[in-house]
Amino acid sequence: MVCKALITLCIFAAGLRVQGSPTPTLLPVSLTTKSTAPMATWTTSAQHTAMATTPVASATHNASVLRTTAASLTSQLPTHPREEAVTSPPLKREVNSTDSSPTGFSSNSSGIHLAPTPEEHSLGSPETSVPATGSQSPTLLFSQGPTSASTSPATSPSEPLSASVTSNHSSTVNNIQPTGAPMAPASPTEEHSSSHTPTSHVTEPVPKEKSPQDTEPGKVICESETTTPFLIMQEVENALSSGSIAAITVTVIAVVLLVFGAAAYLKIRHSSYGRLLDDHDYGSWGNYNNPLYDDS
């Protein structure tokens, strides 16, 4: 048990030395790792976005090797003095691989720590192989954050690395996750999908505001019915001028005077006192009460 722990510590120290050593040459494959607080983005140049994928059999073999190594190192090295916080502030790193061979990718020589979640493989993005090499044996580097721990496995030379290529030359790098290792909280594919979210909100059609007439037609009809007499009176007042109003007033007064004058004339014509008496009765008492009587 102690021997296994010592061997594991030696392998871990050798990996740290190789990782800390500067790369001797710069190759055309340049991966720029840009980390933000909630998510991470990996971009690659346009000329290396399409490469042939490696066979599935080698990936299966390497995955089994990584499972065994991860299981042994998880039980022996839960906490190591060299830790990297997963939730560290945003940082930017440029990583250059050491070989142009398209057979695999080495994270020990270039210093890449990739730990994508399994949901990256279920998104159905096109996969391409990024060329990188390494002669180091598979080594697991544990990085424990304040709340969760993530494992960045170093892949063997024959392990494929899949990348999701987009139109703006940004790709999401996916790596094989061992079974016994915890998953990293940040997912490059989630950042890729969230980068398109504002555009969907921007292009979303704005709902048309409805006018009060469209929303409440019944209310508008009731208001028009209640205000109909007022509108008619306003129209009549606007149609009649001051001269027309004066003419109507004079006509009404003339008709009233004519009616009362005709009634008075007819009253006088048909007196209630009756006719005057005959000559032999003219001086009688019956003619004194008659105003038409003249006794002079």
From Swiss-Prot:
Residues with PTM Phosphoserine: S284
Annotated GO CC locations: early endosome; endosome membrane; Golgi apparatus; Golgi membrane; late endosome; plasma membrane
Pfam families in UniProt: PARM (PF17061)
Domain of life, source organism: Eukaryota
Keyword line: Cell membrane, Endosome, Glycoprotein, Golgi apparatus, Membrane, Phosphoprotein, Signal, Transmembrane, Transmembrane helix
Main localization, broad class: membrane
Induction per the UniProt record: Induced in prostate, after castration. This induction is reversed by androgen supplementation.
Record note on modification: Highly N-glycosylated and O-glycosylated.
Segments on the Extracellular face: 21-244
InterPro entries, per the entry: PARM1
Positions with biased composition (Low complexity): 97-111, 146-175, 195-205
Record's compositionally biased regions (Polar residues): 125-145
Stretches the record annotates as Disordered: 73-220
Tissue: Expressed in prostate. Detected in other organs at low levels, these include the heart and various tissues of the urogenital tract. Not detected in mammary gland.
Cytoplasmic membrane side: 266-296
Family of the protein in this entry: Belongs to the PARM family.
Function: May regulate TLP1 expression and telomerase activity, thus enabling certain prostatic cells to resist apoptosis.
Protein name per UniProt: Prostate androgen-regulated mucin-like protein 1 homolog
Gene behind this protein: Parm1
